[in-house]
């Protein structure tokens, strides 16, 4: 059995813990019966022995299969990790969603993405990454009576993501401690209005106006102070055709959306300016996790 789970970018500026989208960059997990339990790691984290000893995917997979009381053989898990860790690209969400979906498949349970998403909420209590990891596309989410309700819009093929990935990690939990506990009504209204406008742009595929929707006054500036180069990334992106430019999740990655014809030029400029950073041109994924 093979499952692929996409990277995701959340918040998108003002949509704190509510908005996210899916990128065409996947972790691929292969699970086969084996005489003994074993794990192989390739790609991101392959040299990290702790990922073998304390593997979150295996832990969640085992927890879910035990719930179904299914007697299972030993498995060999092969992880091809392409999503960078702790860079704001949904690496933990990919693990959570992938583990739950794999457990359902192995146990013969019908794959219901809504059910899997709500199961994932137990492990990550904000849906902005887990929702697009499940469904793909641009997703807005709310939590109502402890359940996630989502709306998905497919993203057009005329735009691409130019993602800047710094060499510095940024832990979401630590990043959240930097944020104020209270906001003014003006700040809240500003973010609400921009998040609503941004959502409308994605739904209508009116990408030329994305830059007016991705403005945030609650978290981005504070988080970007950990890596001041990101302010320059945003400035350069807008000077070279970016439709929107925002911190990806809690960082450290930065998401720039451009028309596809502008992607190579922006990536070239950003790579030259920030040689220590990785710059990727990515399509958007409209499917979410999938079995192959």
Swiss-Prot record:
EC numbers on record: 2.7.1.39
Source species, domain of life: Bacteria
Annotated residues for binding of ATP: 84-94
GO terms for MF: ATP binding; homoserine kinase activity
Keywords attached to this entry: Amino-acid biosynthesis, ATP-binding, Cytoplasm, Kinase, Nucleotide-binding, Threonine biosynthesis, Transferase
Family assignment from sequence similarity: Belongs to the GHMP kinase family. Homoserine kinase subfamily.
Record's function text: Catalyzes the ATP-dependent phosphorylation of L-homoserine to L-homoserine phosphate.
Protein name: Homoserine kinase
Gene name per UniProt: thrB
């Amino acid at each position: 059995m093979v499952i692929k789970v996409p990277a995701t970018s959340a918040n998108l500026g003002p949509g704190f813990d509510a908005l996210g989208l899916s990128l065409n960059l996947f972790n691929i997990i292969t699970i086969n019966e084996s005489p003994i339990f074993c794990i192989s790691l390739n790609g991101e984290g392959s040299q990290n022995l702790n990922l073998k000893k304390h593997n979150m995917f295996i832990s969640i997979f085992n927890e879910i299969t035990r719930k179904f009381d299914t007697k299972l053989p030993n498995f060999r898990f092969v992880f091809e990790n392409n999503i960078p860790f702790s860079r704001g690209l949904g690496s933990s969400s990919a693990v959570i969603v992938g583990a739950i979906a794999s457990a359902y498949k192995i146990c013969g349970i019908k794959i219901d993405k809504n059910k899997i998403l709500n199961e994932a909420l137990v492990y990550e209590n904000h849906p902005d990454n887990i929702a697009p990891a499940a469904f793909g596309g641009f997703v807005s989410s709310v939590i109502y009576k402890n359940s996630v309700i989502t709306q998905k819009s497919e993203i057009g093929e005329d735009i691409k993501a130019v993602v800047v990935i710094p060499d510095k990690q940024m832990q979401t939990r630590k990043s959240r401690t930097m944020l104020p506990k209270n906001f003014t009504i003006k700040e809240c209204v500003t973010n609400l209005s921009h998040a609503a406008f941004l959502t409308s742009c994605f739904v209508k595929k009116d990408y030329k106006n994305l830059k007016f929707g991705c403005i945030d006054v609650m978290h981005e500036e504070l988080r970007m102070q950990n890596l001041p180069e990101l302010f320059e990334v945003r400035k350069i992106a807008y000077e070279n055709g970016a439709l929107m430019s925002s911190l990806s999740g809690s960082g450290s990655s930065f998401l720039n959306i451009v028309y596809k014809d502008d992607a190579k030029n922006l990536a070239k400029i950003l790579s030259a300016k920030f040689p220590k950073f990785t710059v990727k041109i990515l399509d958007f994924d409209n499917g979410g996790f999938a079995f192959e």
